[in-house]
Amino acid sequence: MNKIYDKVKECYKQVNEMTEFKPQIALVLGSGLGDYAEKIKIETVIDYQEIKGFPVSTVQGHKGRFVLGYVEDIPVMIMEGRVHYYEGYSMSDVVLPIRLMKMMGAEILFLTNASGGIHRGFEAGDFMMITDQIASFVPSPLIGPNIEEFGERFPDMSHIYDEELQEVIRKSADHLQIDLKEGTYIQLPGPNFESPAEIRMCKAIGADAVGMSTACEAIAANHMGMKICGISCIANPAAGISKKPLTHEEVQQSADRAAPKFQKLVTECICRMGKSLKK
């Protein structure tokens, strides 16, 4: 058997012993957005440290626990704090939580993050629906022997972000009168912020927002046949777009300010997605 698969399976076995909860939607919360989980009807909370072998987030603003419960009547599994490649974890560990949530029963993966705005039309506090991604600057989580239990060797990436879910997000934002941007997200390894020259490169190859997560998670989820959608909270203009130095504190503060609007948007999206799952 494959060691990576065995590790995910062992984590699944442990979580399954802690709860019988079966999520339909998996939600990953980015920097500063973690308080959303406090608003749902909570069924179970599992700290990552309770799961032997599970990677633990070390980043400020990432709590490091699963919250399982209901948004309205939709069963969701929320990651309050993701792990990042720059923390020193292998890419297989970075995407282990995604694979676990799929094993738990989640059909949809809803990714969120705080990112730097590359597009000149973006301002801090804007929301960008991710329509495509660039992940060429970080290792693919699919490198190594293919894990047949998860998916095929060469998965297609033409429509990573599900078009029906994108339409759900558009309608949700329109219903709430939230100005929704759209664009391509690029993941760079971090933990250092990007240089102005790197941002010029990102812009030249078609990126609208930049961050240090998300794209690798989408690759793993796509491999397993999950439906994927994503929203970036534009926390700050990327290097060279603004002349101010970038700090993680600024990212958190900006995400905190956007949180109330973000929470409404996510709730509306999940309710609409849940209805589509029942059809």
Task: Please describe what each predicted stretch is.
Residues 1-157:
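Metabolite-binding pocket within alpha/beta catalytic cores that recognizes anionic/polar moieties
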Residues 102-105, 203, 222:
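Non-catalytic positions within long, well-ordered alpha-helices that form the structural scaffold/packing
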Residues 107-108, 208, 227:
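Short acidic/polar active-site loop segments enriched in Thr and Asp
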Residues 134, 138, 142-191:
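Histidine/lysine/aspartate-rich catalytic loop segments that bind and position anionic ligands
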Residues 166, 172-208, 266, 273-277:
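Active-site/ligand-binding-proximal alpha/beta "capping" segment
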Residues 212-250:
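Zn-dependent metallopeptidase/amidohydrolase metal-coordination segment
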Residues 239-279:
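His/Asp/Glu-rich mid-to-C-terminal helical/loop segments that flank catalytic regions of hydrolases
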